[in-house]
Amino acid sequence: MTIRLLPPVLVNRIAAGEVVERPASAVKELVENAIDAGASRIDITMTDGGRARILVVDDGRGMDPGELSLAVERHATSKLPGDDLLDIHTLGFRGEALPSIGSVARLTLTSRAAGAGDAWALTVEGGAKGEPEPASHPQGTRVEVRDLFYATPARLKFLKAPRTEQMHAVDVVHRLAMAHPAVGFTLSDGTRQQIRLSGAQGELFEARLTRLGAILGREFSDNAIAIEAEREGIRLTGHAALPTYNKATSAGQYLFVNGRPVRDKLLHGAVRGAYQDVLAHDRNAVLALYLDLPPEMVDVNVHPAKAEVRFRDPGLVRGLIIGALRHALAAAGHRASSTVSLAALGALRPAQGSGAPALPWGAGGYGGGASHPGLEERRSAYAAQAPAGTPDPWAGRGMGAGGGSGQAAMAWLAGAPPAAPRLAGEPEAPPTGAEDFPLGAARGQIHDTYIIAQTRDGVVIVDQHAAHERLVMERMKAALAERGEVARQILLLPEVVELDEPGAVRVATAAAELAKLGLVVEGFGPGAVVVREVPALLGDTDVKGLVADLAEGLAEWGTAQALEDRLGDVVATMACHGSVRAGRRLRIEEMNALLRDMERTPRAGQCNHGRPTYVELRLGDIERLFGRR
């Protein structure tokens, strides 16, 4: 077969196979054209998931008859003032979208240029172009696509159900709306409006957060921290959710480069690196990041649908993202997402039909009026059996601010021994003013695991092990950053730890790196190592358990060389073993010291595995649980 030139219609259909993969692809191209035309409002309507009809109407600059005719010609565009493909300041630049769509569908364009007295319409069917004709239309452009893929029916077999195709279009419009908050968007399926976004006003940073909240939900905007950094001409802005607000997949991660939504593996790798010691391995951060950089530093012409880009210096971009995210997370301090408290409140709400009797809201009981019979019985029984002089814990409205004798009485009622009286010279509970601290004043400990603290307007419940684990880890990281190693303490009796032979070899091979972290180990024959020094921060730790966990981690992380890149994981493992354990009873002053350390420590809102370290319940929410509000 001899080589021949393909006819223009076939060329356009081949291009359409790359550019217009599905109805959402056509929506993307048409909406990008509208944004490039300076539109402040874009309305999209889809019928039958876009198969039957796609309508995009904008109020942009519009086109005159000559431009209208050129717009449907292949590689005709107004967006490249020169011949430099690296000097691109618009979303579109190839001039492929309209001719590609027109080659596989019935396309009608109606447009009126700014300042023009008349509108013009042009039709393209299966690649056959008509002539511009006078029409009626306000300033802007109206693009109607009917019978998508009618000229290439084989493509229709690959489309999903109409609802699925509609959802793909919703995702496309959401991404473009995040990138351009000043533009208003609507998307309808002909019967129901699925997107309605007004153009956000004011400063760009706040406008973006408003738009993100409208799309990702109020929970995201309530739990988002601002990201802002710049390095070597690259500016990074955006918002990232606190680690305790996360998702099971990376679908909640959005990257925009010079206003263009892109999907880039670089983003996911950088985000994972930034969140590695504050997020569980099976959870993913939620964020939207905006990169603004000179056009010559990024190539946007590497993907048919322009969904991917290539950076001239990907290492610089990755470092900027990781550094900015880590700095913002550290600046957030002990803050945890509101979803943690909401989840706790949801678990506390009495379930209708459960075995426990439920009080009607606002009826009797704890707020005055007729008391609950069960409480009256318990109060009478308590008065008859309690030791003489023990105060009535039900007297007044609560147990008292300091959790003193009333607390002891309640402990006795629960079967626990009363709290020992304070000895001479023993520190008193913190003054009432301690409630003004962000995490409040410690009032007690339950199950020797959870610290109960009272704030000015609520209650904080702290997981003492998770919280101390984060404190130890941050101290070790700070020591590494300042001195290059962690202070060590010599064991009076070296500890011999038996492992399987491969595990012992892995630990012994990593001895130099582990020594920087304060753990001095040596090989001790086949299947064993001897530990001579441990990090001083860990105190009295379970050496055998620590080394066993490190051996398992090294099997997952790889060689000792790879260990240098996984120091965060090693430090997290050590911190876990060196922290206050669940089941250890603490004194009030120890609890308060832990709370104050949390307030001063970055990333203290979550442990090294990404779990929350505390839950805060507002007084108003607690009162609603008991029908007081």
From Swiss-Prot:
Name of the protein this chain belongs to: DNA mismatch repair protein MutL
SUPFAM superfamilies: ATPase domain of HSP90 chaperone/DNA topoisomerase II/histidine kinase, DNA mismatch repair protein MutL, Ribosomal protein S5 domain 2-like
Pfam families named in the record: DNA_mis_repair (PF01119), HATPase_c_3 (PF13589), MutL_C (PF08676)
InterPro entries reported for this sequence: DNA_mismatch_repair_CS, DNA_mismatch_repair_MutL, DNA_mismatch_S5_2-like, HATPase_C_sf, MutL/Mlh/PMS, MutL/Mlh/Pms-like, MutL_C, MutL_C_dimsub
Biological process terms in GO annotation: mismatch repair
Example of a GO cellular component annotation carried by this entry: mismatch repair complex
GO molecular function annotation: ATP binding; ATP hydrolysis activity; ATP-dependent DNA damage sensor activity; mismatched DNA binding
Superkingdom per UniProt: Bacteria
Name of the gene encoding the protein in the UniProt record: mutL
Organism lineage string: Bacteria, Pseudomonadati, Pseudomonadota, Alphaproteobacteria, Rhodospirillales
UniProt keyword terms in alphabetical order: DNA damage, DNA repair
Record family assignment: Belongs to the DNA mismatch repair MutL/HexB family.
CDD domains membership: HATPase_MutL-MLH-PMS-like, MutL_Trans_MutL
